[in-house]
Every structure is written in C-alpha cells, then in structure tokens.
C-alpha cells in the first residue's frame, strides 16, 4: 500500500509545503510575474499559462525527480558517479553562495533604499544583520518547518494578499494595457520563455535534502514515505506558487496600464504600491522583499551546508553554514558583479543538463538505460556549454542550431542523444 502509517498528511503536510514554497519564493519570483503582467497587457492570462508551465511545472518536477532518485547526487549518479560529484558541486555553488545567496541581501536592501537611503555603511550593516539572522535560523535545518513554514511564510502571504486586495479594491486602472509585440504574437510561448528564465528547477535540485530532513523531523522515517511526502509537499508548494503568481501577474497588468514605462518588475510593483498606499506602500513592499529574500537565503544556506557536510563529513554543518554565510555577505558588499560574470554563464550551461536529468527520471523504467542518461546529458552539454561560455567558433556554430535564439538550442541535441541511447 502506498499510504503507510507514516504518510505525511494534514497540518504537517501543509507546513512542509509552506516551507518549500518559502524557500522557492525569492526576489526573482516576486519580480518576474508583475513584469510579465505589465508587458503582456490584455494577453496576460494566455502568457501566464505558459509561464506557469516552466516556472512552476519544471521546479515541482525537479522536486519529484530528486525525491524519486533519493537526492541530487543519486539522480546525477545515473550518468556517472564522477559526473554526479562535479555536477552537484557546480549546482550548489553556482545557485548558492556564488549567485542567489548574496543577491538575497543586495536585492532586498535595494527595496529599502527609498526608506533608509543608500550608503556603503548602511548596506554593510544591513547585510551583516541579514546573514547573521539567516545563519542562526539555518543552524537547525530540520526545524525550518517551525521557522519558515509556521511563521515567516504566513507573514509573507498576508502582506502579498494586502497588496493584491488594495489592487482589487482601489484599481489604478480600469483594465490591462496593450501587449508588447512578443506577447501580442505568441503570448503562451513568450510566457514559457519567461518562466524558463527563473531557473527554479536548479533550486528544486538543491532543496530536496533539507525538505527530507524536515519530514523526518515530524516522525516520518520510512524512506518511501519520505519520498512520497516530499512529492506531496512539492505539489502543495506548486499550488501556492500558482495562486501567488496569478495575484502578482494581475497586479502587474493593472500597474502596467496605470504606470506605463516601468522597465523592471520591481519598478512595476513600486509604482503600484506607492500609488495605492503612498509611503506605507513602500514599507509594505520592502517588507515583502525582505521576508521573501530572507526565506530563500535560509533555505539555500541550509541546503548548501547539508550537501557539503555530507561531502566533507570532517567539517561540521555549523562551520560550513557559517563559511557560506560569511562568503555571501562579502560578495554582497564587494564582489557580486565579478562573481556574477562567472556564475551566470555556468548556470546557463548547467540548467539544460538539469532539465534533461529531470525529464529522463520520468521516462518509463525500461527506457532508463545507462546510454539514455549518458548520451542525453552529453549531447545537451555539447550545445549548452559552448553556447554559455566563450568557445570561439564552436560557440557560433552551437548558437546557430534551431531554437538557439530562444535559449533552447540544446533541445534538439538532447532529443538526438536520448534517441540514440534508446536505439543502441
């Protein structure tokens, strides 16, 4: 039977789902949907369907794939053990301390500058408090359901609902604006492209181990029950993302019509919050960004710390978490631009590989032959790595492949590799 006595249900399931949602929902997740709404205008809901497929469907599939495989190293290990170690290290570093963790502090501080002003000292003090608090919350990764799921996630949802309610009760415009050319032509396709840019499927690969720890902490210890609980929590988080993204997309559609010319999602939200509530709106929006960024920061520190503690068991988890929190604080203040110039191309190179790992995991077992895994990943990497990193003439050739202009040049090689693996 699938439902054992240890099945994760009821309030415990909701808490774990809330925790996973709060780990996913960072600054980028706040910014992308409103900007889509502002740009898509009257084509907003068609674009939103496409956005949901790639911005929600892919990450939740990633959570399920990692749960089914028993962790990211096990999933990537279906290709080769050495590949698994290299790939996992790249994923954890590039989306953790080399990109997303330092950006949680710098982005949330940006939203505070209209209220507190901009200064180097102010940013340093903010990041010091931010990362110190995040470190202490992440110090007990198995307790995140109590800290994120029970407290911070509900607080974040309440603030977003207040902003949405203000938009409904005092709409700044009577309807949505005129869609830009890309959304007018193929709104759903453009929405898929926008959702792909969130790269949340990589975050999904990161979070599996910490979610499993939190499920075990509520008394679920059977391996199969933990896997099923992780997948169910992923579905809860996906449903929450769908509802919150829909609210933010509507907010963006109204804001785009009332305040045209905003060139970022943050500007779209700022214009509407200020128009609805004045200075109180600025405080509301800053609080939303700070809580969302803090939740993601905690989740990433815990995930990266757990992975490297397993990889290097001689180093304690608290020491590893402290190291990455300190490293992220320094990067947020002195070296973020330089590290982004390296980590973003690496992310672009490995993201298609992550998607192929997720996709092959869901193939029927009789098709999951070693060659399918290896050739699928190899052919994907042969396109994605030269396209993302400077490889001279080879990069030019790879960027000439079908769908390269849309960021999907890896898709045809991946399908060819999987096809060859199935035939041989």
Where are these regions (language model features)?
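TM-loop-TM module centered on a large, flexible mid-protein loop between adjacent transmembrane helices
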Residues: 73-80, 244-294, 301, 310, ...
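Hydrophobic, membrane-embedded alpha-helices of multi-pass small-molecule transporters
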Residues: 15-25, 166-173, 182-248, 284-293, ...
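Select transmembrane alpha-helical segments in multipass membrane proteins
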Residues: 9-20, 45, 81-95, 124-129, ...
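Hydrophobic alpha-helical segments and their helix-loop junctions in multi-pass secondary transporters
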Residues: 97, 101, 157-184, 201-202, ...
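Membrane-interface loop-to-helix entry segments
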Residues: 138-167, 343-355, 374-382
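Hydrophobic transmembrane alpha-helices that form the core helical bundles
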Residues: 35, 69, 82-117, 293-310, ...
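Membrane-water interface regions at transmembrane-helix termini and the short interhelical loops
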Residues: 67-74, 131-152, 217-220, 329-342, ...
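Selective recognition of specific alpha-helical transmembrane segments in multi-pass small-molecule
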Residues: 57, 61, 155-167, 231-256, ...
